[in-house]
């Protein structure tokens, strides 16, 4: 796809990083193509709190033990959070360069096994934030115990929303850490966000 772009196309390309090795390698290949064609681009931190290479021990090597890693990583994140939200400017000119004629029916599997997930997960940013709010209001205070019992609805169930970019871990951290000093279960939940990055 990127190799078909022409230098005369007036566009800028933006994307968020995905941190699996194959994706990082692909990012480098895309960078080379865009630089060669003189097309401007910018990529941003993915759905994480910190870039992995920014959290190291004093000697510059990666942490091998979770507790010191997370103590350091959480502080780096807190120190970097801006004090107030910046205003997001709307894009004035946008061009759709994806001309796929595939319909929803064509790209979905022939068997409708995926329909059962409708009762568990409704994909949207709005639903992700509703789920987070419901978890904070009703279950986070007992998360430390309830998460260990599959028969209890004790987890946040936010994984698919995080995976598909419908909620950012920074929003989860910000909203769920408000009462962190009052409840050890909240601390345990926040630590789970750290495990994603470790």
Show the residue positions of the predicted features.
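Trp/Phe/Arg-rich N-terminal binding region typifying the photolyase-homology
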Residues: 1-81, 185
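Glycine/tryptophan-enriched, flexible segments
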Residues: 62-197
């Amino acid at each position: 796809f990127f190799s078909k772009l022409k230098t005369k196309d007036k566009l800028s390309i933006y994307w968020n990083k995905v941190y699996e090795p194959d994706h990082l390698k692909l990012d480098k290949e895309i960078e080379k193509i865009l630089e060669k064609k003189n097309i401007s681009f910018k990529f941003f931190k993915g759905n994480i709190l910190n870039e992995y290479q920014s959290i190291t021990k004093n000697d510059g090597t990666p942490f091998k033990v979770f507790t010191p890693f997370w103590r350091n990583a959480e502080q780096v994140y807190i120190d970097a959070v801006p004090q107030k939200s910046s205003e997001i400017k709307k894009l004035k000119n946008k061009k759709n360069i994806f001309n796929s004629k595939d319909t929803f029916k064509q790209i979905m599997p022939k068997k409708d096994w995926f329909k059962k997930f409708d009762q568990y997960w409704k994909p949207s940013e709005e639903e992700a934030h509703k789920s987070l709010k419901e978890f904070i209001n009703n279950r986070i205070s007992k998360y430390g115990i309830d998460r260990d019992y599959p028969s209890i609805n004790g987890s946040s169930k936010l994984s698919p929303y995080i995976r598909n970019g419908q909620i950012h871990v920074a929003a989860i951290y910000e909203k769920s850490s408000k009462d962190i000093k009052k409840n050890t279960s909240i601390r345990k939940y926040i630590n789970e966000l750290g495990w994603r990055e470790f």
